[in-house]
């Protein structure tokens, strides 16, 4: 089974990017998440992402590195495992430029040469210990995932966009039929206590938001075609949103669709994955990286991080302690 990785990245210090952003919005606005510095800034840790892939997941077939034509100066673009992808290579021109990561994600299946089985990474998701293909895909080729509900009553932009996804899911799928058909997948003992809410709301007639581990996500490329066939008007409308919006859809639509189509195998992703909001858990993030407690970690940025420079120095030292050697992706 060929498995590819896809990662999106932006360098907000690039003069051309700044010019394009200024034309679309004007200036960075840290009072609004969708326009904030944390949405676009680079930690300088990208080399550790590549080192982690090479050391902990050397089996990957190809890395599709998606940018708006940017690349770090240290990146060896001649590496045969690397495919540089410009937004213009796979996103319709009428939706570009975009500063909305969800638009980049709607069209991932159109990346030239992408394998049917792929794993999508944001640039704050890192591999920190040996990770086999079976972490992402079962032997039968289906993605490993966790199908459990969570309450989503939040007022944040992110919470609202997740509810937009669920409205579409309920339009196309019958919850009671899906849970009956795939009982063993939805009520797998693999999930442990994470499935408590699913059990509690079993009789409720509508889908809720599915729990999001917020880390590297395995997909079937064919899932994207299926969602586009069913939801083209909604996805095309959402693609016009140059910046994040309350009326957005998100990649969780594709993931939830995949689950509702029974195109997954149960796996409790929380057992080896952890998200660390750096605003409140910077020390825990550093400790987890140094001790390699998880296969995957997310270091989630915020403009409200106290002692930002010190936090970044500590994180870099932690990554350097487990990934000190240059990868073949570095010049």
Where are these regions (language model features)?
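ER/Golgi luminal nucleotide-sugar-dependent glycosyltransferases, focusing on the catalytic module
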Residues: 1-119, 126-331
């Amino acid at each position: 089974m060929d498995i590819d990785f896809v990662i999106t990245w932006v360098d907000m210090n690039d003069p051309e990017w700044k010019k394009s952003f200024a034309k679309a919005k004007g200036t960075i606005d840290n009072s609004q998440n969708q326009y904030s510095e944390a949405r676009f800034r680079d930690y300088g840790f990208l080399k550790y992402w590549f080192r982690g892939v090479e050391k902990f997941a050397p089996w990957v077939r190809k890395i599709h590195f998606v940018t708006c034509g940017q690349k770090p100066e240290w990146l060896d673009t001649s590496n045969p495992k690397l495919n540089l992808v410009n937004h213009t290579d796979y996103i319709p021109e009428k939706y570009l430029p975009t500063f909305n990561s969800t638009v980049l994600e709607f069209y991932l299946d159109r990346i030239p040469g992408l394998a049917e089985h792929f794993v999508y990474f944001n640039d704050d998701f890192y591999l920190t210990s040996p990770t086999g293909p079976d972490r992402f895909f079962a032997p039968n080729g289906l993605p490993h995932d966790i199908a459990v509900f969570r309450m989503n009553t939040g007022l944040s932009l992110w919470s609202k966009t997740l509810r937009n996804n669920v409205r579409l899911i309920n339009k196309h799928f019958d919850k009671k039929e899906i849970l009956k058909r795939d009982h063993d997948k939805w009520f797998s003992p693999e999930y442990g206590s994470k499935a408590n809410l699913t059990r509690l709301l079993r009789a409720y007639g509508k889908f809720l938001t599915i729990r999001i581990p917020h880390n590297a996500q395995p997909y079937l490329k064919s899932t994207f075609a299926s969602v586009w066939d069913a939801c083209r008007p909604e996805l095309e409308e959402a693609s016009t949103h140059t910046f994040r919006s309350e009326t957005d859809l998100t990649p969780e639509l594709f993931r939830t669709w995949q689950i509702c189509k029974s195109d997954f195998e149960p796996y409790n992703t929380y057992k080896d994955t952890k998200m660390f909001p750096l605003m409140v858990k910077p020390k825990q993030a550093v400790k987890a990286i140094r001790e390699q407690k998880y296969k995957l970690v997310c270091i989630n940025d915020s403009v409200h991080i106290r002692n930002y420079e010190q936090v970044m120095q500590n994180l870099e030292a932690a990554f350097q302690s487990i990934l000190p050697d240059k990868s073949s992706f570095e010049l």
